[in-house]
Amino acid sequence: MKLPISQRLLACCDYVSPGAVVADVGCDHGYLSIHLLETGLARQVYASDIRPGPLDSAVKNANKYGVSQHISFYLSDGVQALPRDFDTLVCAGMGADVMISILEKAPWLRDERYRLILQCQSKTPMLRRYLSQTGWTIRREQVLRDGRFLYTVLEAFWGPGEPLTPGQCYVSPALLSGKAPLLPEYIAWVRDHLGLSVNHKSNPDPWETEAYQELCALEEGL
């Protein structure tokens, strides 16, 4: 039977190295976990959710698709209840504030053994800024369309990197280097939304203003 998995989740799976031990935090119905095991990308998955309902659904789906022997389920706030022997943390479909809270509550993740795969639903510049300021380096990032909307998926490693400028918090160097077909559309969309904020305030935020100026210059150079 065909797994009803979204393009956003498939894009997250593309960044998982074969044979990984994955923590799928905010697993919802478990589709990402199931796909990783069906395709052999993960050899073990720790699936967690803070809500009992979605977690129960994930358990049922794992049994339905025959992969339950390789998934352990946890009712957990972020990674708090999970074993620490995974190597890849996937968070998909959350806002930046939730992802940042998860990372802040688990300082032990700041270790080279872990990598993050993050698909942010809102306030993505806030997430990029946080990662840059706390020692994470965005190694890869891609933009994709799922339905009517554009999303990004990023991969981050713990370790030193060049601090992001305000504009790079909106369009990261990793995203630019990928040269995805949707990149110009994404940059224009981000610039338009940021412009609404900057141009309609009597006292615009200096950080947002600098970011907007960077994005306008970036568009001119494309």
What is each stretch, according to the model?
Residues 3-19:
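Conserved alpha-helix/loop element of class I SAM-dependent methyltransferases that forms part
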Residues 19-28:
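Conserved class I S-adenosyl-L-methionine
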Residues 30, 34:
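Glycine-rich SAM-binding Motif I of class I
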Residues 44-49:
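Conserved SAM-binding motif I beta-strand of class I
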Residues 51-53:
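Conserved SAM/SAH-binding beta-strand->alpha-helix loop
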Residues 56-84:
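S-adenosyl-L-methionine
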Residues 105-155:
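C-terminal substrate-binding/active-site "lid" region of AdoMet-derived donor-dependent transferases
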Residues 159-160, 166-222:
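An accessory alpha-helical subdomain
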